[in-house]
Amino acid sequence: YGRVINTSSPSGIYGNIGQSNYGAAKAGIAAFTVITAMELAKYNVTVNALVPAALSRMTAGLVGMDNLSDEQKEAMSPRWQAVTAAWLCSEEAAKVTGRCFDVRGDQIGISEGWVLGPTGTQPEDPQDLGPLMTELMSKARLNANMGGHPSGGTGRPENEI
């Protein structure tokens, strides 16, 4: 029996300009979390990761952080990470494993992995994949950090936004 809680980063899940090395390392932590969860399940050990959007000494110098309101600063307090970590260590979370939790203030999300088509299989024809991808993209979080990308970060061409 046990609990492992790793720390990844939004840079490793969603990317951040100028942080390719850091983002790659934190993406590795996310993958490590999923794989070790599989490997340690037989020992009743859960492995999860926090993906914190938190204001700290490390993030204080990032662009835009000095313009945050007091309310935004509170929402990005590291204390929210502690609440999620404590819950992941609880008995209530005994079956939660291999997940990466995006945590920012009163907001929490789960980074999703594989999504299959309506038949439960990957379409073999690109024409058949199109409708599934359109549906998935319509439900996906828009990545506003894709500065300079023609889609403006939506993953869709400008004329379809």
Language-model features: locations:
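Catalytic tyrosine of NAD(P)H-dependent dehydrogenase/reductases that use a Tyr as the general acid/base
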Residues: Y22
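Residue(s) in the substrate-gating loop at a strand-loop-helix junction
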Residues: S9
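Active-site "substrate specificity/gating" loop of NAD(P)-dependent dehydrogenases
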Residues: G15-Q19
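C-terminal helical subdomain
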Residues: A49, L68-I161
